[in-house]
Amino acid sequence: MERIKELRNLMSQSRTREILTKTTVDHMAIIKKYTSGRQEKNPSLRMKWMMAMKYPITADKRITEMIPERNEQGQTLWSKMNDAGSDRVMISPLAVTWWNRNGPVASTVHYPKIYKTYFEKVERLKHGTFGPVHFRNQVKIRRRVDINPGHADLSAKEAQDVIMEVVFPNEVGARILTSESQLTITKEKKEELQNCKISPLMVAYMLERELVRKTRFLPVAGGTSSVYIEVLHLTQGTCWEQMYTPGGEVRNDDVDQSLIIAARNIVRRAAVSADPLASLLEMCHSTQIGGTRMVDILRQNPTEEQAVDICKAAMGLRISSSFSFGGFTFKRTSGSSVKREEEVLTGNLQTLKLKVHEGFEEFTMVGKRATAILRKATRRLIQLIVSGRDEQSIVEAIVVAMVFSQEDCMIKAVRGDLNFVNRANQRLNPMHQLLRHFQKDAKVLFQNWGIEPIDNVMGMIGILPDMTPSTEMSMRGVRVSKMGVDEYSNAERVVVSIDRFLRVRDQRGNVLLSPEEVNETQGTEKLTITYSSSMMWEINGPESVLVNTYQWIIRNWETVKIQWSQNPTMLYNKMEFEPFQSLVPKAIRGQYSGFVRTLFQQMRDVLGTFDTTQIIKLLPFAAAPPKQSRMQFSSLTVNVRGSGMRILVRGNSPVFNYNKTTKRLTVLGKDAGTLTEDPDEGTAGVESAVLRGFLILGKEDRRYGPALSINELSNLAKGEKANVLIGQGDVVLVMKRKRDSSILTDSQTATKRIRMAIN
C-alpha cells in the first residue's frame, strides 16, 4: 500500500510525468536488451510503430510499373526512395489495398487444392455445433496431441522427398520414393497442381501440413482427437468449458481409432494361440485398415496404446519407455530400484511369489480418466496424489497404486483364493492376480489401509475409505488434488524385446507391457478393418467362421486337391481349419474326424469315387485329432446360430448347399464362391483338351515329384515328365511332347490312355 501511495504522489507532480514521457532511454542495459540478437523483443510494439510510418513495406521494383503512383483519393502509394540495404522500393499499406481491389486476378482453381486443410477446417466449423458453456473447475493435463486434422502419416523425411518431387521436380538431389503412400500422394498432387501459379514455397508449406503429423504438448480436459484440438481455445478455459460436436471427421483420427481396435483384437486373439508371437506377426502382416497395410500404419503412426505398442514391439520398432499397469501409464520420474523375489502370504494364507522392487521411486501415473503422482519405498506407499474426473476414476487410480506399492496390508486384505486366468486359461502373474481381485471389490483394501489426520494444503483434500472427501482425515498417504498430473512429455523411443508370450521388456529386463494390460473394451472401427488371417475369422462369430472356412477351401481348391491325394496329414494340420473346431461339439469331434478320414481314404483307394463337393464339405471335420471307432454318420452337427445345425454327409442342407447348375456354393445362405470345375460330370473332355501336347505314359511315378495341377503343366519344358492330378482325383505320369505336329491326335488318345493308366 505504502509504495502505491508513494507512486501516486510522484505521478501527481508534473515533473515526473515529463521525465517519464520525454526523456530518451539511454540506459546501456535497456539499449542492450532491445538491440542485441536478431530476435524481436517486442513484436507487437514494433509492428505498431512500423505501420505508423508512411512506407513500412518493401516490394520488388517491378511493382512501380504495375501500380499507379496515387490512388483514386490522391494518396501516394509508393515512395521514390529505395529501401536502405536492398534494391527494393518502399510502399504504403494503401498499395496493398489497391492491389487487392484492382490487381491482376489469377485462376482460383488451385486454391481449394493447395489450402485444402483450411477449406476443410472451415467446413468442419460450419457444420459443427457449439453447446452451452459450463462454469466449473477444469482438470487439464498436458498430453501430446495431434494439432493438424486431415494429414497423412508420413515421416518428416518421407514428406520432404514428396514435397521436393512435387514442387521442384527438376531440382537435383537423391530422392527415393519407396512407400506406397509416398508414390500415391506424389502422383495425386502432381496431377492436381498442373499450371498452378501459387508460389512454390507456399505450396511446400501447405503440403507439409497435409502430409506430416504435428504434435504439441497441450493442457487438455476432454477430447484429444485432432478435430477437438483445433478448437481447443473455444471449448475450454481455466474455469469454463463449452460443449462442441465437430462438423466432420478426419481420416487421421479415424486411422488412430481403427488402429487401436485392430491391435486390441489381434493381441487378444494371438494371446490364446499356440505361438502368440508368430500369430501376432502373421495377423499384423495380413490385416488392412481402410485399405492400407496395418504394418505400414504401425511404422508411421505414433499412437501410444498398449496393444498398438505390443504390435510395434513385435515388428522390432522402438516404443515409449514408460510401462503400463492396470491401464495406467507409469513413468518413473526419480529414484531407482532393484528387483528381488519374495514369498508373501495373502489374507487367505495363499503363498504368492512377488518380484519386489527395493528402493525409493517416484512415478507419474496417467490414465484415460485419472492421473496421479506416486512416491513409494520398498513395499511401502509414501504418498499418492490423485486427480480424476469422477469418484469411480479416482477409485481405479487408488487401487492400482495400492497394488503397485506391494504393501503388506494390501496383500493381507485379500479374501478368498486368487485364481484369475487370462484368455488362454493360463494363471495370471501375482501382481495381476492382486489387481483383478481388488478391481472387483476394494472395500476391504480401503478399510485395512489405515487413516491419518491431514494438514490443510491448498488445492488438496483428504479421502476416506468410503470415498467421501474430508479436510480433517484421509487414507494414509493418499490425497486428492484439483490439479491433474501432466502426461510424460518426453517422446523418446527405446529399443525393446518381446518374448513369445508377448511380454515386452526394456534393455534392463523390466516388463513394460503384456497382454494382460490390453483394454477389453470393444468399439466399432471408423475405417474398414480387413483381417485376411484365418485366426480372425471368429471375430464376427460362428457364422463367419463357417463361411470363411469354405471360402478358403474353394479359393485354394487346386492346391488343396493335390494335398488331399498326396499328403492329407499336412492338409489336416493347416491352421485355416483351427477356428472351425470350436463349432464342432467337443464330445464328438474325434469320432467325426476319424469317420471323415476313413471315408477320404476309401475315396483315394476306390477309383471313380472322388467327389469334389463331398471333400470340400467334410474336409474341415477331418482336422481334429481322430478317434478310431466304427461309427458311421449320415449328418454332422455344427454349433451356429445358437444351436446345432446339421450338415448332411450326402446331399445339401441349409448349412452347406451346392447348386450343380450354377456351380455356386452357399453356406448358411451366404455366397461362399464358385467351383471352377464341375465335380460330378468328370472332366475327361476338358482334360483331353488340356493334355494336348502331352503324352500319357502311365500310372503315377513318385520319382517325378509331387503331382501338379493341370494349370501348372504349362511350365514344363519339352520332353520333361511330371505327375499330374486329373479331375477324378487320380494321378498319372505325362511327358510334354517334343514336336507340336502330333498334338491333334493327343486329345483322342488321351481319354483312352487316362482310362488305361488308371485301371
Swiss-Prot record:
Its main location: virion. Keywords: Cap snatching, Eukaryotic host gene expression shutoff by virus, Eukaryotic host transcription shutoff by virus, Host gene expression shutoff by virus, Host mitochondrion, Host nucleus, Host-virus interaction, Inhibition of host innate immune response by virus, Inhibition of host MAVS by virus, Inhibition of host RLR pathway by virus, Inhibition of host RNA polymerase II by virus, mRNA capping, mRNA processing, Viral immunoevasion, Viral transcription, Virion. GO terms for molecular function: RNA binding; RNA-directed RNA polymerase activity. GO terms for biological process: 7-methylguanosine mRNA capping; cap snatching; DNA-templated transcription; symbiont-mediated suppression of host cytoplasmic pattern recognition receptor signaling pathway via inhibition of MAVS activity; symbiont-mediated suppression of host gene expression; symbiont-mediated suppression of host mRNA transcription via inhibition of RNA polymerase II activity; viral RNA genome replication. It is found in: Virion; Host nucleus; Host mitochondrion. GO terms for cellular component: host cell mitochondrion; host cell nucleus; virion component. A motif (Nuclear localization signal) lies at residues 736-739. InterPro entries: Flu_PB2_2nd, Flu_PB2_6th, Flu_PB2_C, Flu_PB2_CAP-bd, Flu_PB2_middle, Flu_PB2_N, INV_PB2, PB2_helical. The record marks 627 as: Mammalian adaptation. Belongs to the influenza viruses PB2 family. Plays an essential role in transcription initiation and cap-stealing mechanism, in which cellular capped pre-mRNAs are used to generate primers for viral transcription. Recognizes and binds the 7-methylguanosine-containing cap of the target pre-RNA which is subsequently cleaved after 10-13 nucleotides by the viral protein PA. Plays a role in the initiation of the viral genome replication and modulates the activity of the ribonucleoprotein (RNP) complex. Influenza RNA polymerase is composed of three subunits: PB1, PB2 and PA. Interacts (via N-terminus) with PB1 (via C-terminus). Interacts with nucleoprotein NP (via N-terminus). Interacts (via N-terminus) with host MAVS (via N-terminus); this interaction inhibits host innate immune response. HAMAP family: INV_PB2. This is Polymerase basic protein 2.
